[in-house]
Structure formats: C-alpha cells, structure tokens
C-alpha cells in the first residue's frame, strides 16, 4: 500500500482553535511530505473535544477512511471539567477504534497551560501534529499488512 492509495480523515476541535489549527497544519504538512495528496484527506471541524468521538465514529463506520486523526486541545481550568473532558474524549476515541477496527489517532493535547499547548503545536517542543500524521500512516500500513479476511 502506497501513500497515494488510501484515504484518511481528520476531526478537529474548534475550541482552542489557535492551537488546533497549528496541529492541523502540522498533520497536513507531514502528510504532504509523505506523498499524501489533498484529495485523499477529509477534514471535519467539530465544536469541542467532546464531540470528536462521535464524528470519528461516523467516519470510521463509513468505511471510506483507513484512519481518522483526532485533534484537540484541552487545557486545564479552575474546575473539574478538564478531567471529565479528557476522560470522555480518550475513552470515546479508543472505543471507536476497537469497534470499527479503524486506527483512531488520539491527537488531543491535554495540558495544564496554554503555553504548554502552544509549545507542542509548533513551538519549542515541535508540532505533535507531524507525529500523529506519522502514526496514522504507520497504522494504515500495519492494518493492511495484518489484514484478516472473513472466512
């Protein structure tokens, strides 16, 4: 399987958009470097991180995409909301991957401060989006290599 023979989707949270746009750019730039064309990628924006798993499920269920990259930035505030959001999003994404056997790449930053988020979205810690693009392509290849046929 070559990079020009598959399709993937990206689900991006609009909340903390200044961070998530940078993560998206990191994913798209790396995919381009790997030879993936724009017509192989579908990008969908959702209101917040909690909405990511539902759209990931819809995309995985469609069987049109060999991987779904989920991007978000959950930054700790003064309440417990952060804990609930992080848990729901990570669990939801994992459930989708297991139910549909489609790689769901968990590209949701969970940080204590905005500075930590920006550092990982093209700042001094690099752009994690590139790492998640690599993970998506790697998982697509592994899933194809270990393909199980129904008998």
Curated annotation (Swiss-Prot):
The keyword Transferase applies. Gene3D superfamilies: Lumazine/riboflavin synthase (3.40.50.960). It catalyses: (2S)-2-hydroxy-3-oxobutyl phosphate + 5-amino-6-(D-ribitylamino)uracil = 6,7-dimethyl-8-(1-D-ribityl)lumazine + phosphate + 2 H2O + H(+). Its EC number is 2.5.1.78. The active site is at 81 (proton donor). It comes from the Bacteria. 5-amino-6-(D-ribitylamino)uracil binds at residues 15, 49-51, 73-75, 106. (2S)-2-hydroxy-3-oxobutyl phosphate binds at residues 78-79, 120. Disulfide bonds: none annotated. HAMAP family: Lumazine_synth. Belongs to the DMRL synthase family. This is 6,7-dimethyl-8-ribityllumazine synthase. It comes from Coxiella burnetii (strain RSA 493 / Nine Mile phase I). The gene is ribH.
